[in-house]
């Protein structure tokens, strides 16, 4: 280990930055956030330093580097574009036993500054020891995507409860189990983020009053249409905290590879070699696993509340008193149309969009007269088997037979395939396409030749 990672308490302590440019400004911003009493010494200063000085946030000393400025300091940073000046600052600080950072010269520095993920009071620092700053930045960005923005508020609130937890729970094991359920409670985190004091208090009292082996919870997560990059940050956080993930065939392998490694996985979809699990059985799986105290993620393709039967699953949980929450996903209509160069709305062609299921409840019938109206885009989910009927009904109710249509197979994935044609051909076109696929009907389909971008990459 070439460097010892430490966190310095700099509040109301003197620090010096030598340099007045953009790099010095970035370093100054960090020290000011840490509460340092800051002096900046340079020949010239960019405007931001003058603004800070006018607001009384720091002191500016214009002119060449003055060693005497180091005397009261705990820490210094050399951030000029002159290597000789930076070396001078480093040597002067070293002789006074003051830690000094030299920008872009780790060998000349007595400390280096890491990439920081700030969820105050929780802080995460990432460093490559100065050997690969880009790698450290990329790791920081990955951690930024994983750690919720409101995590700091949760940590702050946890600090306020420590005395109460210590008083109520006698053993270390009990305290550990309490904190484990505290830090994964989405309702509490969201209430803190919303500054909803009433909800925070209610959730807190529930956490303290329920047994430590209480029933678990279910999180309904939309996985998006296929491309793992379209999974939301909150969705990613949930699948990485799950004890068990119940998923269907519309969830891509790339997304399943992001699930916590030691989480149990239960496949409930339909594909070669598997039978479709009835919806009622899926409901019971969610209920049973949550009642064991597990954190259950029900992972669905697209958005769980758009033809995903998410509402039915939650009704079962609600009736049983199981806590639940929902993380929406990018629905297939949005993802597949965007990846196919098909804007769902357009001021010249479509002033509205309709999302329609092609899989009707027994005895159901669609409002074909309104669906056949002009100036709109229709998106049919699960419509391949009904393509001939969709064609027949729309034409019968007045839609032009030459209306452009597109069928998007495996949308947003590297296997995406788009078949174009006219409404009069829809039944035949559907025979060329395999599920999962969407049917898009409307004048906007005619823009595909101009706006298609995904296949060209």
Swiss-Prot record:
GO terms for molecular function: NAD binding; precorrin-2 dehydrogenase activity; sirohydrochlorin ferrochelatase activity; uroporphyrin-III C-methyltransferase activity. GO terms for biological process: cobalamin biosynthetic process; methylation; siroheme biosynthetic process. CDD domains: SUMT. Its EC number is 2.1.1.107, 1.3.1.76, 4.99.1.4. It catalyses: uroporphyrinogen III + 2 S-adenosyl-L-methionine = precorrin-2 + 2 S-adenosyl-L-homocysteine + H(+); precorrin-2 + NAD(+) = sirohydrochlorin + NADH + 2 H(+); siroheme + 2 H(+) = sirohydrochlorin + Fe(2+). InterPro entries: 4pyrrol_Mease, 4pyrrol_Methylase_sf, 4pyrrole_Mease_sub1, 4pyrrole_Mease_sub2, CobA/CysG_C, NAD(P)-bd_dom_sf, Siro_Cobalamin_biosynth, Sirohaem_synt_dimer_dom_sf. S-adenosyl-L-methionine binds at residues 225, 301-303, 306, 331-332, 382, 411. In the N-terminal section; belongs to the precorrin-2 dehydrogenase / sirohydrochlorin ferrochelatase family. This is Siroheme synthase. The lineage of its organism: Bacteria, Pseudomonadati, Pseudomonadota, Gammaproteobacteria, Enterobacterales.
């Amino acid at each position: 280990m070439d460097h010892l990672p430490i966190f310095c308490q700099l509040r109301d302590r003197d620090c010096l930055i030598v340099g007045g440019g953009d790099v010095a400004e970035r370093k100054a911003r960090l020290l000011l956030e840490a509460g340092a009493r800051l002096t900046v010494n340079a020949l010239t200063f960019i405007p931001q330093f003058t603004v800070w000085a006018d607001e009384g946030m720091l002191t500016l000393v214009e002119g060449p580097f003055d060693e005497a400025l180091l005397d009261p300091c705990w820490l210094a940073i050399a951030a000029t574009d002159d290597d000789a000046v930076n070396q001078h600052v480093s040597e002067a600080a070293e002789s006074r036993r003051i830690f000094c950072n030299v920008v872009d010269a780790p060998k000349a520095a007595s400390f280096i500054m890491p990439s920081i993920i700030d969820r105050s009071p929780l802080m995460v620092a990432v460093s490559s020891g100065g050997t690969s700053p880009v790698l450290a930045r990329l790791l920081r960005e990955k951690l930024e995507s994983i750690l919720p923005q409101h995590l700091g508020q949760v940590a702050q609130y946890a600090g306020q409860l420590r005395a109460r937890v210590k008083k109520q729970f006698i053993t270390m094991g009990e305290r550990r189990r309490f904190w484990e359920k505290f830090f994964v409670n989405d309702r509490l985190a969201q209430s803190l983020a919303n500054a909803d004091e009433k909800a925070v208090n209610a959730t807190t009292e529930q956490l303290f009053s329920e047994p430590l082996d209480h029933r678990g919870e279910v999180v309904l997560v939309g996985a998006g249409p296929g491309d793992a990059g379209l999974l939301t940050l909150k969705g990613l956080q949930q699948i990485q905290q799950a004890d068990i993930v119940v998923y269907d065939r519309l969830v891509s392998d790339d997304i399943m590879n992001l699930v916590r490694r030691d989480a149990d996985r239960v496949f409930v979809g339909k594909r070669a070699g598997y039978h479709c699990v009835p919806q009622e059985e899926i409901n019971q799986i969610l209920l049973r696993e949550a009642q064991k105290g597990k954190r259950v993620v029900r992972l669905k393709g697209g958005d769980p509340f758009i033809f995903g039967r998410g509402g039915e699953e939650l009704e079962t949980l609600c009736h049983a008193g199981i806590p639940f929450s929902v993380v929406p996903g990018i629905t297939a209509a949005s993802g597949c149309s965007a990846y196919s160069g098909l804007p769902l709305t357009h001021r010249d062609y479509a002033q509205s969009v309709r999302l329609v299921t092609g899989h009707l409840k027994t005895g159901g019938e669609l409002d074909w007269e309104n669906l056949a109206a002009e100036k709109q885009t229709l998106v049919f989910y699960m419509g391949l088997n009904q393509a001939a009927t969709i064609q027949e009904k729309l034409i019968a109710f007045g839609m032009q037979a030459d209306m452009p249509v597109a069928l998007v197979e495996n949308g947003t994935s590297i296997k995406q395939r788009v078949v174009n044609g006219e409404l009069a051909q829809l039944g035949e076109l559907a025979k060329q396409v395999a599920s999962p696929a969407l049917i898009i009907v409307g004048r906007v389909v005619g823009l595909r030749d101009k706006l298609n971008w995904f296949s060209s990459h």
